[in-house]
Swiss-Prot record:
Keywords: Ribonucleoprotein, Ribosomal protein. One of its GO terms (biological process) is translation. Belongs to the bacterial ribosomal protein bL32 family. It comes from the Bacteria. GO terms for cellular component: cytosolic large ribosomal subunit. InterPro entries: Ribosomal_bL32, Ribosomal_bL32_bact, Ribosomal_zn-bd. This is Large ribosomal subunit protein bL32. One of its GO terms (molecular function) is structural constituent of ribosome. The keyword rRNA-binding does not apply.
């Protein structure tokens, strides 16, 4: 099994990790209650998806 011959410097390690950025999730507004929600998912606030009631949400 292959092993590294030389140690990589911290600057090389950090240059490689420079592209590991985490992106903020895209949010869409629920058409029913106007609360932000993840796209293509049931709204956690009102429980609707594509205009239909999917979840019973306690209010």
């Amino acid at each position: 099994m292959a092993n590294p011959r030389h140690r990589h410097t911290p600057s090389r390690r950090d240059k490689r990790r420079a592209n590991w950025k985490a992106t903020a999730p895209n949010l869409a507004l629920c058409p029913e209650c106007k609360e932000p929600k993840l796209p293509h998912r049931v709204c956690p606030n009102c429980g609707t998806y594509k205009g239909r009631k999917i979840l019973e949400v306690e209010e």
